[in-house]
From Swiss-Prot:
UniProt xrefs under InterPro entries: GH10, GH10_dom, Glycoside_hydrolase_SF
Domain of life: Eukaryota
SUPFAM superfamilies referenced in this protein's UniProt entry, alphabetically: (Trans)glycosidases (SSF51445)
Organism, as annotated: Humicola insolens
The protein, known as: Endo-1,4-beta-xylanase A
Alphabetized UniProt keyword annotations: Carbohydrate metabolism, Glycoprotein, Glycosidase, Hydrolase, Polysaccharide degradation, Secreted, Signal, Xylan degradation
GO BP annotations listed: xylan catabolic process
Length: 376
């Protein structure tokens, strides 16, 4: 969602407490892996975003890189990845017609090397946008060409590599109206249709997603996202999925029923759903109480994805707390992921395990039916 900067200093919990060895830890499935459990539950993947090589810029963490890379690329925890920043407009086209795919290519290459799905992110977004786009007074004709040229170059460069593209990111206000981005001010909702239409032409095999935050419970904003799905479907323009970013708060998280209702609201429109940027921040320093709330929140949102057939996968927005964007945008909050600074696991890790393994205890028929629908 946002560009993470340098290392934040988080008070470190005692190892046993941080690893979730207190009350309610549950069985350690570290030898199994979240992606393995997710696939047994009928999901397509459980993944983590990464800012490789951006992570290398975090001074003082050099000794952490080998273990980070082992978990990210060489363990059974993750079956997919997303470049956190490397495919965004600011980085790939900083000047008009001048493209730099270096960071995105590193992640794409590693995903290919280690047999992981690649979710690509994000073609058109108002934030982390190159200044030349935002600061120019465009005519409609000129801005259409800018959008088409950008998507053609970027999606074309990664053609055949991306399981899915977040084509348009965060186009909505909280009340469900359109955000007044440079794209909307000049073109109105036409820019959304143009972006999806162009992406479909350039990479016809990629799943095309609308992606946004605060879509994880029924609200005016979820209704706005449904309007976007209907807009594209009515125009016969491909849209295959809606991404629920799921940047949540441990102390005030939605219920399981809220999540299920929101996900079903989209799948009933004939699109798949994925949790695309999952993290659940809490007030720091972490306590036993808010870590328990975080565990419950992770269990609810992952459990909802497992329980609704059209929800195909989960991506956490990195997995290692020191690499999270959260502390730089929310003062006094952090520890939003599943691994602490010492690489011990949050109690929330075991909440995710519980959400995934509860599904595996259901009938083989329900899992087979789900897999058949995913392959359809």
């Amino acid at each position: 969602m946002h560009l993470a900067s340098s290392l934040f200093l988080l008070a470190t919990l005692p190892f046993g407490f941080a690893a979730g060895k207190g009350k309610g830890k549950g069985k350690d499935n570290s030898d199994v892996g979240l992606d393995v459990l997710a696939k047994k539950a009928g999901l397509k993947y459980f993944g983590a975003a990464t800012d490789t090589p951006g992570q290398r810029e975090r001074a003082g963490l050099e000794d952490k890189y080998p273990e980070y890379d082992r978990i990210m690329w060489h363990s059974p925890e993750f079956g997919s990845t997303t470049p956190t920043n490397g495919q965004k407009w600011l980085f790939v086209e900083p000047e008009r017609g001048v493209f730099n795919f270096t960071e995105g290519d590193v992640v794409a290459s590693k995903a290919r090397q280690h047999g992981k799905l690649l979710r690509c992110h994000a073609l058109v977004w108002h934030s982390q946008l190159a200044p030349w786009v935002e600061e120019t007074e465009w005519t409609p004709e000129e801005l259409r060409k800018v959008i088409v040229d950008h998507i053609t170059a970027v999606a074309g460069h990664y053609k055949g590599q991306c399981y899915a593209w977040d084509v348009v990111n965060e186009a909505l206000n909280e009340d469900g109206t359109y955000r007044e981005s440079v794209f909307y001010k000049v073109l109105g909702e036409e820019y959304i249709k143009l972006a999806f239409e162009t992406a479909a032409k350039v990479d016809p095999k990629a799943k095309l997603y609308y992606n946004d935050y605060n879509l994880e419970w029924p609200s005016a904003k979820t209704e706005g996202a449904k309007r976007i799905v209907k807009l594209l479907k009515d125009a016969k323009i491909p849209i295959h999925g809606v991404g629920l970013q799921a940047h949540l708060i441990a102390e005030q998280h939605p219920t399981l029923d809220d999540h299920i209702a929101a996900i079903r609201g989209f799948t009933q429109l004939g699109v798949e759903v994925a949790l695309t940027e999952l993290d659940i921040r809490l007030k720091t320093p972490a306590t036993e109480e808010n870590l328990a709330l975080q565990r419950e929140a992770y269990k609810n949102v992952v459990g909802a994805c497992v329980q609704v057939c059209g929800c195909v996968g989960v991506t956490i927005w990195d997995f290692y707390d020191p690499f999270s964007w959260v502390p730089y945008f929310f003062e006094g909050e952090g520890a939003p992921l599943l691994w602490f600074e010492d690489f011990s696991k949050h109690p929330a890790y075991y909440g995710v395990v519980e959400a995934l393994t509860n599904k595996t205890r259901r009938s083989k028929r329900s899992i087979s039916d789900r897999r058949a629908k995913l392959l359809a």
